[in-house]
Amino acid sequence: MTRYARIIGTGSYLPPKRVTNHELAAQLAEQGIETSDEWIVTRSGIRARHYAEPDVTCSDLAAKAAERAIEAAGIDRAEIDLILVATSTPDFVFPSAACLVQQKLGLSNHCAAFDLQAVCSGFVYGLATADKFIRAGGYRNALVIGAEVFSRILDFNDRTTCVLFGDGAGAVVLQASDEPGILSTALHADGSHADILCVPGNVAGGAIKGSAFLYMDGQAVFKLAVNVLDKVAREALALAEVESSQIDWLIPHQANIRIMQGTAKKLGLPGERMVVTVDEHGNTSAASIPLALDAAVRDGRIQKGHHVLLEGVGGGFTWGAALLRF
């Protein structure tokens, strides 16, 4: 009998501190940097974002989202046999955020736990990885988390990037099933574009070598993102032999409303079939897709049997898509 993986529970967590464009603009004005709500909304669709407090870590956010996903799944947390955290902003160089989540969940079953880094494509990469683990037969209940504290790597002297990103976490529980849940996944990367979206620094000899802040060539990212997202979405659909007209919900990486609308248009999907949270969350990198997925599940938009297409693109350059039957 063929073994599949299905999402049986979703969860998410946003730090309580919500910062509107007006509040951020006022903060930047004190530094002599000019921006406005209109400027930010016009270019990105973002109206607010959430920031973690200084003593809150990536694994803290991840664990809270994980608890909610496990509760929604209706399983005992001791049944989790794989934890995978997609993040670019872990607590430490090591140990992994996944091991810290395991500790914070109180899991003593010695389940496998590791991090995966594909920036804003991270959750799709993580979902595809966990799907393969389950299909191979060695694992039954996988916890896949996207979690970020991007506010820690923003240069608040650069108005073109600091207004775009926020913090948060989203999680799903994948379970082995006889019924198809994840219908297809497609992953790609092109390292020749590594320099258009990056944090070009590292720790060497106890000091930071290079820059510890995010750098982005916005125009280059926009041009590449719209093109590769359309291609990888069609690839995932073709692998599952599903037409774009059969998609009930499109959940793209929540980076920029113009990129998202461009992708939906290329697939021939009306805007009302796209889940949008970028206005309230900003770009939360690997957390953006599971945050949006959880929102649409909990408010009842996503129903059992719906076809849901997830797609992400991020630094590396990486991109990927996953087609689900919920």
Swiss-Prot record:
Pathway participation: Lipid metabolism; fatty acid biosynthesis
Alphabetical list of Pfam families matching this protein: ACP_syn_III, ACP_syn_III_C
GO function term, MF aspect, one: beta-ketoacyl-acyl-carrier-protein synthase III activity
Gene Ontology biological-process entries: butyryl-CoA biosynthetic process from acetyl-CoA
Annotated stretches, region: ACP-binding: 254-258
GO CC annotations, alphabetized: cytoplasm
Record has Acyltransferase as a keyword: yes
Reactions accelerated catalytically: malonyl-[ACP] + acetyl-CoA + H(+) = 3-oxobutanoyl-[ACP] + CO2 + CoA
Record localization: Cytoplasm
Active site annotation, chain numbering: C120, H253, N283
Record flagged with keyword Ribosomal protein: no
Keyword tags: Acyltransferase, Cytoplasm, Fatty acid biosynthesis, Fatty acid metabolism, Lipid biosynthesis, Lipid metabolism, Multifunctional enzyme, Transferase
Classification via InterPro entries: ACP_syn_III_C (IPR013747), ACP_syn_III_N (IPR013751), FabH (IPR004655), Thiolase-like (IPR016039)
EC number(s) stated in the UniProt entry for this protein: 2.3.1.180
Source organism, top-level taxon: Bacteria
Record remark: domains: The last Arg residue of the ACP-binding site is essential for the weak association between ACP/AcpP and FabH.
Subunit structure: Homodimer.
Function: Catalyzes the condensation reaction of fatty acid synthesis by the addition to an acyl acceptor of two carbons from malonyl-ACP. Catalyzes the first condensation reaction which initiates fatty acid synthesis and may therefore play a role in governing the total rate of fatty acid production. Possesses both acetoacetyl-ACP synthase and acetyl transacylase activities. Its substrate specificity determines the biosynthesis of branched-chain and/or straight-chain of fatty acids.
Family: Belongs to the thiolase-like superfamily. FabH family.
Name of this protein: Beta-ketoacyl-[acyl-carrier-protein] synthase III
Organism whose genome encodes this protein: Ralstonia nicotianae (strain ATCC BAA-1114 / GMI1000) (Ralstonia solanacearum)
Upper lineage: Bacteria, Pseudomonadati, Pseudomonadota, Betaproteobacteria, Burkholderiales
